[in-house]
Structures are given as C-alpha cells and as structure tokens.
Swiss-Prot record, chain A:
Name of the featured protein: Glycine cleavage system H protein
Protein task: The glycine cleavage system catalyzes the degradation of glycine. The H protein shuttles the methylamine group of glycine from the P protein to the T protein.
Listed InterPro entries: 2-oxoA_DH_lipoyl-BS, Biotin_lipoyl, GCV_H, GCV_H/Fam206, GCV_H_sub, Single_hybrid_motif
Annotated positions of the N6-lipoyllysine modification: 60
Amino acid sequence: MTSVRYTKDHEYVRVEGDVAVVGISDYAQQQLGDVVFVELPEIGKVVTKGGEAAVVESVKAASEVYAPLSGEVVEVNSELEGAPGLVNEAPEGKGWFMKLKLSNPAELDELLNEHAYKDFLDTLA
Amino acid sequence: MNREGRGATTPHSIALSGPETFTGNRALDLEEGLIFEIGRIEVTGVDIAEPAPFRDRLGTQARTAPLDLPGLSEPEAMRHYVRLSRMNYGIDSGLFPLGSCTMKHNPRLNEKMARLPGFADIHPLQPQSTVKGALGLMAELSRYLLELTGMQAVALTPKAGAHGELCGMMAIKAAHAARGDGDARHVVLVPESAHGTNPATAALIGYQVRAIPARADGTVDPEAVKAALGPEVAALMLTNPNTCGLFERDVVAIAEAVHAAGAYFYSDGANFNAILGKVRIADLGVDAMHINLHKTFSTPHGGGGPGAGPVVLSDALAPFAPVPALVATADGLVLVEDEGADGAEQALGRMSAFHGQMGMFVRALAWMLSHGADGMRQASEDAVLSANYIRACLMDLMSAPFAERPAMHEALFDDTWLAGTGLTTLDVAKALIDEGYHPMTVYFPLVVHGAMLIEPTESESKASLDLFIAALRDLAMAAKAGDKERFLGAPYYAPRRRLDETRAARAPVLRWVKPAQVADAAE
C-alpha cells in the first residue's frame, strides 16, 4: 500500500518499497507560482529530517525545501533542470524532487496523513 | 526580438483615440531598437585616420568574418540614449514608492559639492599628503555617523549594504576567533522578518543560519530568541525597523539575551532612515550595523550611482575594523593601509581596494550638513508620517496586516482585499504603471501574503501623496467593481506590454544574437 504523508512546510513523501519519493505539495506549487529553477542535492548526500535538501525558485520567491525524513539521497529528478514547470504541472507526479533511502522509517509516523494535511491547509485559508 | 512585449492591439474597453501609427512611434513616445540593431560598422562618430600600411603577425589568427560592431554617428548615439532614457522612470520623474529600497530625492546641492575639483579630480593612488582635504571630509563624515549612532568606530570602505553586512559579520567572526570560541560558534540567528541579504551574508562566510519565526504582531519575540541561543550561536542579525515596517520594540531585551549567551548583535541598518535622529543605535545594544548612505543620506543609487555601506562598530568589535582605516595621529589624519600596522593591529583585512566611495561620502555629508540635527530628525519624522498617512487613507479599501500598530517608514498591505476579484498583487502593480507610477515592492516581505510595500519617503509633498493615494483608491474601486480587463492586460501604455516573467526566468536571453535568417533573406 502506498500512502502519501505531508509536512507543515508543504513537502510530501510517498514511500515506495524502501525508498521515499519527496517533492512539494500541490498547495505549495500554487503558492509559489510558476517555478523557474530547482536546485537538487547531490546523490549520496545524507539529509536529516527538517534540514535543507533542495531549493525551489519561482517568479515570486526562492524557498528552501526541507527533508521531510532522514536518509540518503539515492536519486534526483534531473528532468527538473530543463523543465522546472513540471513542479507546477504535476507536483506529486513528474514534478518529484528526490528519492531518499530512509535511515529512520519511524519518523514517517510524525508526518501528517492526507486528511490531517487537508485540515491543516484549511487553517491557513 | 526585443520588441515582443509591445502589444499591437488595444482592448475594447480602453480604446486609444487614434489609429495605430505606421512607424510604431506614438508621438513623443519613440520606439528604439537595441544598439546592435541600429548600429552599422561603417559608421563612426569620430574621424580616425587610416593606419599606415603595416604587416600584421596574426597569421591564422586573423579575423575573417566582419566584426559586427555597432557604429553610430554622434547625433545617432545621442538620440539612442536619450530615447532609452525616456522609457525610464526615476525619482526625478515621479513618486517612486519602492518599499524594499528607499528612493528619496538627491538634492542638487549634493551633486554640486561632489563635483568640486578637490573631491572629483583626485585619485586613490595620490600621496596622502596631497589629499588632506578629502581625508578631513572622511573624518567629518565618520564623526557624524558615530554621533548619530552612538557607536565607537566606523569602517567606511564597504561599497553597499550587503557588503557592509559582510564586513560587520566578518568583524564578529574575527572577534570570536580572537576570543577562542570561533570554531564552537557556527550558527547565526536570523528572524524571518529580516532582509534576505542577512542569511545570505551569514552563509557566505560559513555560518549555518537558524531562522526565528515572527510573532503574530510581526515582530521578534525575545523568548524565541532565548530559546534559539546557545554556545554554538555566534550572532543574531536583526533588521530594525523590520521589513514589515515595524519597530522591534523588544530590541533591548533581545540584545541582552544575545550578549548573555556570548554572541554578538548585528543590526541591519538599511531602514535607519526611519529612526535617524530619534534612536541612538548604541543604546539598543548593537555591536555592528551598516548604514546605507545611498538610502538614509540620499545619495543616488538603483542604477543612478554607486552605493556606500559604512559599518559602525561597538567597543568589542572596533579593533577588528578593516583597513584602510582613518587614524588621527600627531601629524594629522593618516589612512592606515596595512593590517597589523599601528592603529590596525587586529584589522580583519581589506574589504575593498581603496578607501570606499568618495563621491558618496561627499554627498552624504552635504546632506547631513544642509539638514542639520533638526532637519535630519524631521526627515525621519516626515518619512514615517507620510507612510502612515498613505496607510490610513487606503485602509478602508485595501487590507493592512499588523494595522493595530502605527507603521514606521513603510505602509504594508496584503492581498486579502483582492479576494474574489480574480486579480492578484501583480495585476495591481502593473495597472499602477498605466497610471504613471513606478510600482511598489510586491510579494515582499515573504511573511505577508501578496504583499504590497509602499515607501513614500520624506521627499513627497502632501499634494503628491494625495495624487498617489487617489490613483490607488481608483484602482482598488475598479478592482472591486469587476473591471478586470484594466488590470489583466496592464500595462497598456508602457513602452512594453506585460512581459512573460516565467519565460524570461526559465529561458533567459542573456545575449543579443544577430538574426541570421533575416539577414540572409534580405540579401
């Protein structure tokens, strides 16, 4: 079963086997506006939950993308270099940022599930 | 290729009264190509004699294709730049409400003083004995900056605000190193309401940045600072007044907590113009602060001239000020050029090749002297009054966050008032261009949704402010009345229509390329 979890900083995590796909949520891309540049980490980089993992730049602002979970970067979406607009078109699909090999899968429980994230978004409106 | 933004069509609701012209010019609004589009290699503005016959030694390196330099005659060159300048908008053409960067009138007296030959025609490599007057001016400027801030030392060499930040933070790093805790302290605290250059500066010299969230009222909570402090923290960087245009009222408590934890307090002085003559920076517990001469003291900037970002330092940081440093000796003023020399034993090094922006020093001191203590205080008061006047006059139509407190020198609005109109902050900014104003700062500060930040400065009369307010009120009412076309297609009347910002960022054209196909087809 695949389930998507979210952070309050609007990153999402989708666990597929022993790796987690990380990106920014649909709400985040809407807030940012047209994404024009994505800076991805190097493969092999070890990230800790809440630490800086990537940078996303839109016509409005440059923002940090925090690692929702601790782990090692095993793959990055290099398509974003030439086509940053994928983040707007399909944030949870082709617009993913990186894949992490989790070092502490238990951290997953600390993240919001889809329902809780939706409730959280309602509080921001 | 540079003409793409120019719209050929006019919307139905805002029809121009005349036909499209054959030339693309619209009376005094003249169309103008890039210099590479209008220049021709065979044309020149000067008569240069043909070189005598010579044998070159270029061999296979000799150029075979034409050089394609854009030649223009003198009247053509003159017209090119005058036409481009007419598409520009500056503080000398109208109110420039950019909240992120103070754009105030640069008095012509400043310019007259800066052009005095004794200041304008000197060179940094002249012997010091021949520039005593210039050194005297720098000393007088330093005395004024220290008097206005209550601080102990000033470094004049940084070339602009962010460079000044870097200088101040390098002084802090040098102080920690001298104290022996340089390695242990690797974190710098930066509130969310700080200028974006603050975290960038800290990161540039190897610090890890830790963000401090803002309170609901838009200011920094001393408790949040205390919670983030520790033996690993080197400094706190605080912008005051902050980017929401609010004075950090708890700044003294924050400074005390920072010092108690063994860290230094850096204050971003970009907004010093709001508190000049009202607050002595030293009384707030500040260890280092840069002063943008080009903002607070009216010297031109933003394409109009170089900046200057002197840094004032506390007792603790004064020994680490960079060279060249101005030192008073028995023989008069001396610029100490070498770190380690007398008067600069612990200097952090050199921030720039020479002594700083002399032309800006002259202008800033001219502004100080012509205003006097009462005039400088009034400049701050008028800047704050103007911002609050704008906010009060627009509050019923637009929405202002943190409105329970008076603003400082900036009036901040969010986009709540646009809800349901289908319009965004960007659309309002573009419509303001059609009304003859440079837009305010938009989407900054980041902590406010769809922010519109307006800084009128003390330069504007009440009549001028009233006209600006009327324009914004008319736009706000039009937005609420559903007149969307006025906004979505704006600007209609600018030399270029709305540009595609997304494409410009995703696929920037950074260099002019000769349109080969067009040239071939013409042959």
